[in-house]
Regions:
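N-terminal cap/lid segment of alpha/beta-hydrolase-fold proteins
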Residues: 1-9
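Conserved HGGG/HGGXW glycine-rich cap/lid loop of the alpha/beta-hydrolase fold
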Residues: 8-65
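Active-site acidic short loop of glycosyltransferases
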Residues: 22, 87-90, 112, 199
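Conserved alpha/beta-hydrolase "nucleophile elbow" surrounding the catalytic nucleophile
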Residues: 30-32, 91, 95-97
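Residue in the alpha/beta-hydrolase core beta-strand immediately N-terminal to the catalytic nucleophile
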Residues: 57, 92, 115-118
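Conserved acidic catalytic loop of the alpha/beta-hydrolase fold
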Residues: 74-91
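Flexible "cap/lid" loop of the alpha/beta hydrolase fold
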Residues: 101-144
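Conserved alpha/beta-hydrolase catalytic His-Asp/Glu region
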Residues: 134-197
């Protein structure tokens, strides 16, 4: 499914099911440098359980157009525009890593629509190693390997290799997508206040 927010194309996985107001709605938010691809199995499962599932690509990520947004606050405002455009009145958000920060800030600014937040490998703040940011800013593809190495235990093996290398294919994408995301995560400082407001 494609639609337009702020004159820019937004992509969400089309599950083949029509929106049903009687069914619960869930938005899946990916992490830094990622896309809807990381939620493929989750999207299928939730759709099969009769959820209205919206698996979004953030601006500049995956199949969504535009530049990557530079702050978590801007991403939360964008998310609200998406939710309003889709006509969702009540929803849950399942979020991974950076997506958790976006979900927190959304809950802080727009609590009335939100029923639940599920964190997957998330926290109220995500400080990022300066060396990783510098590597990503330089467009070095090694930043993808380091991100996976620091994020997972040594014994963890990925079938088909590092999933980030399947999403980010060039030094330009590393600079313009991953680096921007990492800086946004590192700069976000409102998480603790947002957590305290969740009831």
């Amino acid at each position: 499914m494609e639609f337009t927010i702020d004159n820019t194309k937004v992509f969400s996985v089309d599950t083949g099911e029509k929106f049903n107001e009687k069914n619960p709605s869930v938005i899946l938010l990916h992490g830094s440098g990622q896309s809807h691809v990381v939620w493929s199995l989750t999207t299928q499962f939730l759709s099969g359980e009769n959820y209205n599932v919206f698996t979004l690509d953030l601006p500049g990520h995956g199949n969504s157009e535009g530049a990557s947004l530079k702050s978590i606050e801007d991403m939360a405002l964008w998310l609200n525009k998406v939710i309003e455009h889709l006509g969702i009145k009540q929803l849950s958000i399942v979020a991974h890593s950076q997506g958790c920060l976006i979900a927190l800030e959304y809950a802080n600014k727009f609590p009335k629509n939100l029923q639940k937040i599920v964190f997957v490998a998330g926290s109220y703040e995500i400080p990022v190693n300066k060396s990783l940011i510098d590597l990503a800013l330089s467009g070095d593809m090694e930043s993808l390997n380091l991100m996976m190495k620091w994020g997972y235990e040594k014994s963890k093996q990925f079938i088909g290799g590092n999933p980030l290398q399947k999403i980010l294919n060039s030094p330009r994408e590393v600079r313009e997508v991953l680096a921007v995301d990492l800086i946004a995560c590192n700069n976000y400082k409102n998480g603790l206040n947002a957590v305290k407001k969740i009831t």
